[in-house]
Amino acid sequence: MRILVISDTHGELGNFLKVMDIEKKVDLCVHLGDIEGQENEIADLVSCPLFAVRGNNDFFSPLPYDIDVKIGPYQAFLTHGHHYGISVGEGGVLEEARARGANLVMFGHTHRPVLREEEGIILVNPGSISYPRQEDRKPSYMIITINERNGKAEFEQKFLKS
């Protein structure tokens, strides 16, 4: 199973189209907020199930703020992160993930990639493919590949070339 994880597209589809051209087929797409009204367009472009959460710029969106979902061997907690103080640190999302029984938390909002494990919980932020804020400012996303036979997952942070 190949999972595309993106966040903070902010209504800009140009780099998303580049990502889809590179990645071709994915089995699941996760959008972690600030989709700005383009959930239908993105769902049509990926031609697979889409889990999308509401970000701080999705003012009138019907999307949920959080999703709890089983993805492969993981109990995943999906959120934009702004309700959990992600701008000042990851403590709030970690605490919420623990409370929900999650061993994988995916979040956005900061526009900076994160991939690490703390206290048995994997933290994933794909960064932003539209407005990256990390030092090199390369648009970023993540591909998670789950081996269907043994359940092992490979997390790959990817960057678009300028």
Q: Which ranges hold each PLM region?
A:
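N-terminal active-site segment of His-dependent metallophosphoesterases
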Residues: 1-49, 58-65, 137-140, 144-149
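Active-site neighborhood of phospho(di)ester-bond hydrolases with catalytic His/Asp-centered motifs
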Residues: 5-7, 28-33, 51-56, 78-80, ...
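Active-site environment of divalent metal-dependent phosphoester hydrolases
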Residues: 10-14, 35-40, 57-62, 84-88, ...
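Binuclear metal-dependent phosphoesterase catalytic core
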Residues: 17, 72, 95-101, 124-162
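Short secondary-structure boundary/capping segments
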Residues: 42, 66-70, 96-97, 113-115, ...
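Glycine-enriched alpha-helix->loop->beta-strand junction motifs that scaffold or abut catalytic
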Residues: 47-50, 120-122
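Helix-adjacent hinge/juxtasegments
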Residues: 51-101
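Catalytic core of the metallo-beta-lactamase
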Residues: 80, 84-117, 123, 129, ...
